[in-house]
From Swiss-Prot:
Residues forming the catalytic site: 168, 449
NCBIfam families associated with the record: malate_syn_A
Protein's organism: Neurospora crassa (strain ATCC 24698 / 74-OR23-1A / CBS 708.71 / DSM 1257 / FGSC 987)
Descriptive protein name: Malate synthase, glyoxysomal
Lineage: Eukaryota, Fungi, Dikarya, Ascomycota, Pezizomycotina
Similarity section: Belongs to the malate synthase family.
Pathway(s) annotated for this protein in UniProt: Carbohydrate metabolism; glyoxylate cycle; (S)-malate from isocitrate: step 2/2
Localization per Swiss-Prot or TrEMBL: Glyoxysome
Any one of the GO BP annotations: glyoxylate cycle
InterPro entries cross-referenced by the UniProt entry: Malate_synth_C_sf, Malate_synth_sf, Malate_synthA, Malate_synthase_CS, Malate_synthase_TIM, MS_C, MS_N, MS_N_TIM-barrel_dom
Pfam families reported for this sequence: MS_C, MS_N, MS_TIM-barrel
Enzyme Commission number(s): 2.3.3.9
Keywords from the named record: Glyoxylate bypass, Glyoxysome, Peroxisome, Transferase, Tricarboxylic acid cycle
Cysteine disulfide links: none
This protein's GO CC annotations: cytoplasm; glyoxysome; peroxisomal matrix
Length: 542
């Protein structure tokens, strides 16, 4: 194995390093990140290029289907994923959120079974957010995260076992531009995974758990194979057995839905199941088929979990997971309490209850909430309908899902001016906050993250591209979209504090809603606005 000094050659950091961050950005940890980068970055780039080739095929009319070359994997009933790891047997309610210190304490104090600490869609990847998030998780694992903010004290509970920690690194498409290795920015995925794993894997094992991850945005089983290769290298490097890591894969792209068996197969000894990432799944469906008029969807509020293509995806995910002995996790309840309107709050919470009931009855092994106040509703539903720790025994052998079911876009509903304005509000509201370094934004009593903003701008793009007509009889074209964008921007900016970023957000948004240019991801489009690269420091000088 190459020495730390050798591995650090060619590694530079251009983000400021504060004293409390030095325990994370150590030469040893960065040399491990460098090893991951040099081992896997070329494969990562090849896989991203493969995504572009696949998009070109879809644009030509080659629709996704189950892969003939992996039919033997799908049809072999004998192989299984890993048995549930310590702390992951019962996952009936999981809370998700960014990794700021207050959120980490509040999440771990919630009445939930696991906490997904998020470096991805609910975090804006400023250098400070990413590195401080690592500091906060390091401290939380060691039970040394208590702190004061003004008069308020934040302390971890000591009256019970804390929820199991699961970390979501950034997706394969994102880079961490503040760290370069041999002149290239490091992958955000490998940076987030590498630092967390290096510092905490052995500590977590000693505490009776393990390094557990949620893996986002994958589009094929080959991308899962890359994670598995990274897991094997990492475990060998620190000297813990292969199979100690667990990864739950978010099925949040339409292409991954056709490769769920294969994704579990690639991660076999590291698999802890799949999750229904509903908003990103809708975004991915619009994005992949954006050039096909037969895939135009109505207002976002019409695209519920019970429409044909969403219902098919849920059923197939549960069936696939349980056939392979791994968890099938339900999706996000994004609602947040409405404190000043009891009737509206009761209606919103009833919607949460109905959604969680649908999931429990469908066979899910657990579900997500974005706010601690929703945990009790989700728990009540799952405790009643799932008295066992999970439902892995519910094989759903009644389910028969084919290509046409996953691509069935018969979604009732219409496109309205209100729907357009809602999409503009959500997109602008989220992008403005993201540019300010905030990745999780309450808008109209829903906790919006990057996925919901992606749905908003993709729908607008699609509606303009195909010249749809609203329920009010108005044709949606470029000038109409830009007119409404200006109106919504002016309204939001006038109500916001001075120094807000709504006009800057609108400049970016305007490029995405005319049916012409289409950025792969909003977060990639905006990333340069939040980078703070300064003087480069060779990592060997740390």
């Amino acid at each position: 194995m190459a020495s730390v000094e050798t591995l650090l050659q060619g590694v530079t950091i251009s983000g400021p390093i504060e004293e409390h961050q030095r325990k994370i950005l150590t030469p040893q940890a960065l040399s491990f990140v460098a090893l991951l980068h040099r081992s896997f970055n070329q494969t990562r780039k090849n896989l991203l290029e493969r995504r572009q080739l696949r998009q070109a095929e879809i644009d030509r009319g080659v629709l996704p289907d189950f892969l003939p070359e992996t039919k033997h994997i799908r049809e072999n009933p004998t192989w299984k994923g890993a048995p549930p790891a310590p702390g992951l047997v019962d996952r009936r309610v999981e809370i998700t959120g960014p990794t700021d210190r207050k959120m980490v304490v509040n999440a771990l104090n919630s009445d939930v079974y696991t906490y997904m600490a998020d470096f991805e869609d609910s975090s804006a990847p400023t250098w400070a957010n990413m590195v401080n998030g690592q500091v906060n998780l390091y401290d939380a694992i060691r039970r040394q995260i208590d702190f004061k903010q003004g008069p308020k004290e934040y302390k971890l509970r000591t009256d019970r076992t804390l929820p199991t920690l699961i970390v979501r690194p950034r997706g394969w498409h994102l880079e961490e531009k503040h760290v370069t290795i041999d002149g290239e920015p490091v992958s955000g995925s490998l940076f987030d995974f590498g630092l967390y794993f290096f510092h905490n894997a052995k500590e977590l094992v000693q505490r009776g758990f393990g390094p557990y991850f949620y893996l986002p945005k994958m589009e094929s089983h080959l991308e899962a194979r890359l994670w598995n290769d990274a897991f094997n290298l990492a475990q060998d490097y620190v000297g813990i057995p292969r199979g100690t890591i667990r990864g739950t894969v978010l099925i949040e792209t339409i292409l991954a839905a056709f490769e769920m068996d294969e994704i579990i197969y690639e991660l076999r000894e590291h698999s802890s199941g799949l999750n229904c990432g509903r908003w990103d799944y809708i975004f991915s469906t619009i994005k992949k088929f954006r050039n096909h008029s037969s895939f135009v969807l109505p207002d976002r509020s019409c695209v519920t979990m019970t429409v044909p293509f969403m219902d098919a995806y849920v059923k197939l995910l549960i069936q696939t997971c349980h056939k392979r002995g791994v968890h099938a996790m339900g999706g996000m309840a994004a609602q947040i309490p409405i404190k000043d309107d009891k009737a509206a709050n009761d209606k919103a919470m009833e919607g949460v209850r109905a959604d969680k009931l649908r999931e429990a009855r469908a066979g899910h092994d657990g579900t997500w909430v974005a706010h601690p106040a929703l945990a009790s509703i989700a728990l009540e539903v799952f405790n009643k309908h799932m008295p066992t720790p999970n439902q892995l025994f519910n094989r759903r052998e009644d389910v028969k899902i084919g290509q046409q079911d996953l691509l069935n876009m018969n979604v009732p509903g219409s496109i309205t001016e209100e729907g357009i304005r809602k999409n503009l509000n959500i997109g602008l509201g989220y992008m403005e906050a993201w540019i300010r370094g905030v990745g999780c934004v309450p808008i109209n009593y829903l906790m919006e993250d990057a996925a919901t903003a992606e749905v908003s701008r993709s729908q607008l793009w699609q509606w303009v591209k195909h010249g749809v007509t609203t329920a009010e009889g108005k044709r949606v074209d470029k000038s109409y979209a830009l007119k409404l964008l200006k109106e919504q921007t002016d309204e939001l900016a006038s109500k916001a504090p001075q120094g807000n970023k709504f006009n800057l957000a609108a400049q970016y948004f305007a490029t995405q809603v005319t049916g012409e240019d289409y950025a792969d991801f909003l977060t990639s489009l905006l990333y340069n606005e939040i980078t703070s690269a300064g003087n480069s420091l060779p990592a060997s000088k740390l």
